[in-house]
Amino acid sequence: MEFSQLVERLQTHIQCHSLEKFGDRNPTLGGVAALTEALTGQISYVDSAKYAPQMKTTQASALILPPDAKLQAEADAQGIAWCATAQPRLLFAAAIAVFYQPYRPPAGIHATAVIDPSVHCGEDVSIGPHVVIYPNVTLGDRVCIHGNVVIYPGVTIGNDSVLHGNCTIHERTQIGQGCVIHSGAAIGAEGFGFVPTPEGWFKMEQSGQVVLEDGVEIGCNSAVDRPAVGETRIGKNTKLDNMVHVAHGCRIGEACALAGQVGLAGGVTIGNRVILAGQVGVADKSEIGDGAIASAQTGIHGKVGPKEVVCGSPHMPHKLYLKASAIYKRLPEMYDTLKKLKKV
């Protein structure tokens, strides 16, 4: 594919009107690569001036650059074709999609799949080996189910969703369109509901449901539990990394990102476009406002306001955390000083 053809496809793919190709260079491209690993015939990207030194040694034939005159001049000096956009990383992601498409088996049902006669399949559905689908399941058009997936009764899965190998979808679960469930994930399993008694624990049946709205992605070995009553809901385009736990009754808004090993206790409410970094823990019934960010290993108790950035456990504003951390490092010295003052 010629560079000019790729630029045209990228403009169409993400409806970007600010992408421009400059110069007469029009190399043939066959793939994408990181800036330091790219070879002739590959395209890469640069999103800030700190990568300018790497441009001097890259073998990439083309680059996606920001609107930075110095970077663009460096590309010209190196004889590299380039295009400019305000979002180089986004365009690079679109370029990857041009050259690479995830494996998808052809439409059809594998001979070893066990499917109840009551299951409704849309058009061009792909069902892999050893899949088990219980009664009254509805599969939309172009749904792809890889090997060893188990789908419990009454589940609904929307058009173009993909279920990777060895994931399990429990009863009382609705999955929207264009969702991706990765290997080992469990969606709709019973929430952790037990009532203490003199004898131990009385099991509270979990009769609620789980709803994944359109475009949700669930990482490997993650779990989204259903509640005793009501629903656990994950909003449109929200992404969960591997080993994320969403407990019963949580409500997560749209376009959120939860990194690996995040754990939400029951009844947590999260707004839209919230980012939780790795190993963040959120106590039961906590509330997190739109656009909030929690750094890695933050322990959230109570409320986090909209667009607030929090750190530490228990959580505190980012600036306060930095001050507290600086003091914490000096505690031994301060303690020694205090002991000396006591002796005076």
UniProtKB/Swiss-Prot annotation:
Pfam family of the protein (one): LpxD
One GO term (biological process): lipid A biosynthetic process
Keyword presence, Transmembrane helix: no
Molecular functions (GO terms): N-acyltransferase activity; structural constituent of carboxysome shell
InterPro entries listed in its UniProt record: Hexapep (IPR001451), LpxD (IPR007691), Trimer_LpxA-like_sf (IPR011004), UDP_GlcNAc_AcTrfase_non-rep (IPR020573)
Keyword check for Signal: no
Cellular-component GO terms for this entry: carboxysome; membrane
Pathway given in the UniProt record: Bacterial outer membrane biogenesis; LPS lipid A biosynthesis
Keywords in alphabetical order: Acyltransferase, Lipid A biosynthesis, Lipid biosynthesis, Lipid metabolism, Repeat, Transferase
Residues at the active site: H248
Documented EC number(s): 2.3.1.191
Reactions that this protein is recorded to catalyse: a UDP-3-O-[(3R)-3-hydroxyacyl]-alpha-D-glucosamine + a (3R)-hydroxyacyl-[ACP] = a UDP-2-N,3-O-bis[(3R)-3-hydroxyacyl]-alpha-D-glucosamine + holo-[ACP] + H(+)
Oligomer and partners: Homotrimer.
The family this protein is said to belong to: Belongs to the transferase hexapeptide repeat family. LpxD subfamily.
Described function: Catalyzes the N-acylation of UDP-3-O-acylglucosamine using 3-hydroxyacyl-ACP as the acyl donor. Is involved in the biosynthesis of lipid A, a phosphorylated glycolipid that anchors the lipopolysaccharide to the outer membrane of the cell.
NCBIfam families: lipid_A_lpxD, PRK00892.1
Name by which UniProt lists this protein: UDP-3-O-acylglucosamine N-acyltransferase
Organism encoding this protein: Synechocystis sp. (strain ATCC 27184 / PCC 6803 / Kazusa)
UniProt gene name: lpxD
